[in-house]
Amino acid sequence: HIVKQTESYISNRRILLAIADAGSRLMYSYKGIATLAGQTSRVYALISSLHLLQHDDYQSVPRPADLPDDTPFYDLGHLRGQLIEDKDHIKFTNVPIVTPAPGQERGGEPLLHSLRVHINPGDHMMVTGSNGVGKTAVARILAGLWPLFDGVLEKPHHDSIMFLPQRPYLNTGSLREQVIYPASYQEHLESGRTDEDLMEILRRVHLAYLPDREGGWTTRKEWKDVLSGGEKQRMGMARLFYHGPSFAVLDECTSAVSTDVEGLMYAHAKDMGITLITISHRPSLFKYHQLLLDLKGDDKYEVINLAGDEQKLTIEQELTDLRSKLEQVQAWKQRLQAIHQELSFSHS
């Protein structure tokens, strides 16, 4: 009898311990379940948005009752913009620059309510402005990544425009494939170009040493880990020279390149007949452009002809800023010496 009671006690004890352990794990798993629920919701929202994007079918958002009548309301469910392709120029006519926000009560977030600018072939334009005013947003609308809420956008066929970001995409392929991207190797062969043609392009961007350094054109590597920041950006310019589009949008794509090499690449691009639209803060690039689109924020912008007196005023302003900074150098040196003395005194 005692033996049976002992067996029952041990068995029940094990069951109770297992139940306690299961309950404990269930309580601790609550945090993981909550995290999974949040991630599932985000993934579902992403997939739903991608399906809507594919079919251009967005749920209409009603205009908020407290929104003033004279304030535009941008709704992805009612896109009124008109896109005209296969033109030989780029023209924005009353195009709002709006950050899309699917499902938000206020619709998109406007950065600029109406942009009007006309870029003919050879009218190289530079886009400047402080952070957050919509410089890159203009390029995204031109590329079709962001919707055209209103107005008219005229532009060439997408094959005639090339976009170069600040950090170019580098695939896990051969060195040759990095230069010809996004074209395939088969398309490269069909074009009739040779490796010597590619070498000439690399010379133009000061990367002629790469084939020897990396082991030839067929070497396959993780190029994003092999190339430096400046080399990556020069590889992006090599792709521009390889494809030779009619228009090129350069979004800070030479920020890690020295000024002299940058100037040579810009000059060569212009010699090829590529119309450049540059997004940058670097005043050294002004001389390669005819137009300046200055986005000032607060729904204001200005289109300046850099061939006129405005260019002189802009350069004079830059020189004034540089002189002001140079005048502060001596004060910075004195402050640095004082800090060194204080540190030396504290250690002693």
Predicted segments, located by residue:
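ATP-binding Walker
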Residues: 133
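Primarily ABC-family ATPase nucleotide-binding module
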Residues: 47-126, 152-157, 271
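The feature captures the beta-strand-to-loop junction immediately N-terminal to the Walker
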Residues: 128-130
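ABC-fold ATPase nucleotide-binding domain signature/coupling loops
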Residues: 118, 171, 189-193, 198-246, ...
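Walker A/P-loop
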Residues: 136
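ABC ATPase nucleotide-binding domain signature region
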Residues: 121-124, 139-193, 281-288, 297, ...
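ABC-family ATPase nucleotide-binding domain "signature/switch" substructure
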Residues: 140, 178, 217-316, 322
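Cytosolic ends of transmembrane helices, especially the final helix of ABC transmembrane type-1 domains
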Residues: 12-60
